[in-house]
Amino acid sequence: MTTQSSSDGRMFTSSIIPVIPDSSPTAAEVIELSSQLSLPSPTSLLDFLSTSTSRGPTRSDTVGDKTQGKEVLDTRPILENSFRRENRVVTGTGGKAATGKRLKRRTESPGNACQSKIHIVSGEQIILGQSRPEKKAAKTKRTKKEDGLINYKLHGRVSKANQTVSRQPETKISAPKECNDTTQPAGNDHINDLDDGLQLEQATQRRFDWTPTKDTTIPVIDLVGDSPSSCEKSLSGMRSTRTMLSNYEFSGVVGTLGGSRSEGTPDAPTTKRPIELLKVNNFKEISGLSDDRQSSITEDSESATSKPRRVKAKNRPKSKLTTITSYATAKYTVVEKSVNLDPVETLLSDEPGKEKSAAKRTSGARCAKPGRKKSTTTEKKNEPPIFKVVHPLEAFKAFGGQELLFGTSSQLANGHSEDQHEQNEGTSHISNSSAFLPLSRSESSSKALSQASLGSGFLKLSSSKNLWSAGARDLTGAVLEIDEIDLSEHRMKPSIFAFQPKAPLGCKADTQIPPQLGEIDSDNSCQKPLAAIDPPEFVTRSETPSEKGVLHKYIVKPTHTNSCSQSGSSISVGSPEKPVQDKPIFNGFTTSELAKKVAAYGFKPIKSRDKMISLLEKCWENRNKAPNSVPKLTPGDGLSKVDEPTKGQSLGPHLQPNSISQKATTQVPKVKPAKRATKSQGVPVSSRRSTSTSKVSRKRTVSPSAILVDDDQTSDSTGDSVPPSRPRQPSKSCTPRDRENTPESFNLPTTPLTIRSGKVPSTVTSSESLPSLYTQITAAIKAQPRLRAFNGVKQPTWYEKILMYDPIQLEDLAVWLNTDGFERIGEDREVWPGLLREWCESKGVCCIWRKQRGARAHCPLVRA
């Protein structure tokens, strides 16, 4: 190998320099120079190979001067950093001057190294030549590398480490292209396979297997072909068409598909369908196969028949449960079982259309009579639990001895029983009769009746008989009596509640006066003795609290003195059978308690608390009233006249004047019976205006013995709100009317006795003439004139104070009403602070007590 160096430092080689790598010593790399132009040195060539083409570490050992050895040492770190290139030797010669030029050329013009290109030929040679125009090919290789062929570099590195340089890169370059060409269509095929697998056709086929849409269309074909199955399934279809189970109960599809699939190999979908098994069983039972035919059935059909039997055994304890769920699912469970079709038909045969159902059954099973006989034997075993669930009468009987699980089912069971309804009506009549007794007595009797007749009573609500009645009542059970009293009021006996507010008192008295009452002789003889009046039919008014437990008497005196002695003819009108009870303080009761009390008296619920209190007070007074009045009518003569008693025998030892004046304010009927009185007796009745012209005449015409009892329960006046009479009006100062104007037949007096408030007696007037104190208080406050200013300060009226939400002192308002307020409106009654507090609470007026200034009074009303 010879080298030539020119004068300018260039080196020319005219021979071939073999390059022998250590990895493959047999192979040889030949570098041919096509021309004698300036070419790079071997070291620069190795650098070029390490950076561009040969990407492996090489080790070069040159034979030459020290400068050439330094060149190798300088290029070694570049070569050793490359990947998998070891012990590569480059043999050649060079001069010192050339080495300096070569380093300079490599550093100054690195593009010259890029001008040489490695041509790979079919042989094991590497030919280096100057090919500057072929730089585009290198760019195309770079662009190919940039296109994403990252595996090209990886495969080149691996192949050059193990194989020859000349042959392996060609195969490895083509290999990744083939891999890329093969992997991409493989990936596309896989994606296409996935796309084909995600189509919804297979899913819809799976859906058609379990959805009942196909089953509903196929039974039409089997109904035409198979007559016995059509009859039986028509009955089942009529029963359960409204539920989802009806779609699974059609046996037409199973009759054909089940027989065909049982002959062949059973598939997985057929074993997973409980519908087919049930329908095969139904087809067998409906067709009426005999015992021999059933024994000849295949094992698949026997296994199919065993499954419904297991379900049948599981459903037996469910049929015994008397719950709402069992009621709702009873008919569906019966229809699902083919064995239970006959008992259902027998139950339906009791209805009017039993002949038609029987005809259908016989026509549908005309060729399967022995099979039906066997089915009836099996049905008799299962009949009692099904009969208890389905048949309502048996279920009602079973409820008596069972502990019910749900309260609602017990309500449905016993709520519509006719016997229970009659029993409730009977107890309502008994409770109505007990309503005429006093409050405590009626409550005790009603509780006893409820516990005796209805079992557990109204408070516990443990019995099923009381659940419907307890739904519309309070905890004490008083509201039920209200409803039943309203419904059965036309069947009630005449009582205090039979007094209608618009009916005349004379009409009611003709039917309600007991036969023991003595009649008055028309020939001016003495009166016959009057027996005691029955408290339930003649209600009396209570006395004031100071007269508790005292029996009072009125002395009845004949109008005209005759052969009978007046002193010996004093007769007691009536005497109560029991002492007067303590009057409860209704203001201290809660609203619920007041509602219960009102319901116990037979009235409808009232929203206003004040109205309930006033109504209860009137009812209590009418019940516990002492017989201090004379009966007003005889069975044929009408009203009897009584006279004022003398000083020695006028009143009982315990009767106080205040009680007499309090009776003067009793309530009177709403409608005047003046027409009847004038027709039967022909006596004119004094008008209201003539009796209320002056206060003096009103005060003088009070007669306690002539006060008539009012039996109306719905008058507006409140018995509790009537205050005791003023001490300046004692009963001794009262003088009776003249007796000369009355006829001798003891009919209505020509000039009736009047009470202190100026009203005519209850036989002539109505309760409208005596308004309630609440309305009178309101009228008096609004009628107050505007006051004059005092020292330049305006004095507001009571009405203006109420409008300005000023606290109203109850004592001051009571004094003003009793002195000035009632006189302006012509009212003689008096009020007290307790009544005014109730009025303020009903009207929403802020009120205070004088002693508790600045605080609202919430304490209950306590009366002395």
UniProtKB/Swiss-Prot annotation:
Organism, scientific name: Paracoccidioides lutzii (strain ATCC MYA-826 / Pb01) (Paracoccidioides brasiliensis)
Gene name, Swiss-Prot/TrEMBL: SLX4
Compartments (UniProt record): Nucleus
Protein's name in the database: Structure-specific endonuclease subunit SLX4
TM helices/strands, residue ranges: none
Protein function: Regulatory subunit of the SLX1-SLX4 structure-specific endonuclease that resolves DNA secondary structures generated during DNA repair and recombination. Has endonuclease activity towards branched DNA substrates, introducing single-strand cuts in duplex DNA close to junctions with ss-DNA.
Keywords, sorted A to Z: DNA damage, DNA recombination, DNA repair, Nucleus, Phosphoprotein
Comp. bias regions, Low complexity: 685-695
Biased composition (Polar residues): 295-306, 656-668, 743-767
Signal peptide: none
Subunit field text: Forms a heterodimer with SLX1.
Subcellular location, principal: nucleus
GO molecular function: 5'-flap endonuclease activity
One BP annotation, GO: DNA replication
Gene Ontology CC annotations of this record: Slx1-Slx4 complex
Residues covered by region (Disordered): 1-21, 49-69, 91-113, 161-190, 289-318, 346-385, 413-433, 625-767
Basic residues: bias regions: 307-318
Family: Belongs to the SLX4 family.
Pfam families linked to this entry: Slx4
Post-translational modification summary for this protein: Phosphorylated in response to DNA damage.
Superkingdom: Eukaryota
